[in-house]
Amino acid sequence: FPQLVAGPIVRASEFIPQLYQPYALTKERAGLAVFWILNGLLKKLVLADYLAVQFIDRVFDNPQLYSGFETMSALFGYSMQVYADFSGYTDVAIGIAMLLGFTLPKNFNSPYKASSVAEFWRRWHLSLSTWLRDYLYIPLGGNRTGSIASYLIVFLFLVMIALVVDQPLLSVLLGVLFAGGYLLMRYSTTAERWVNTNINLMLTMILGGLWHG
């Protein structure tokens, strides 16, 4: 504490020097900290919990009582619930840390604005994605293009993320699906990109929820 278990993940080189800095809390910094905390609580208590209790849990508990449209809406809604819950939690952590004199990195950057699976992971859980990129993806050669090994590394990278977020049973399947979506966008031609972008918008929303479901 104040760096909490679920993130943001802070590297020692960034956090330890802050332990030796004199404590200083300006009015502007205090106001920003309160904003982060209230924003996180709003996401968690108002958006995530309300969606879960009033709609999503009801559909998932008794799907036979609902239409296909309602079930699909619940699936997309669950993606939003996961985002609001997780990002709300880390927003509160950032705000509390700021009140205590520490600066933690931003952990989400509007991930559901992404137009592809690759962009989704550049926006989702930034501290985890960056850590895995620097210590797993790049050292294994994932930034090389066009080789079979690079495809396998993309798959391994996404499976590792699934394992980190505690989804071992779905990790392999979702690793395949995410890697497939990533490679589809990465290697498609210009003529195909418009179609693939719209497919990936839907794929990103659905898999984003399933990954944490």
Where are these regions (language model features)?
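Membrane-embedded transmembrane alpha-helical bundles that form the catalytic cores
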Residues: 1-213
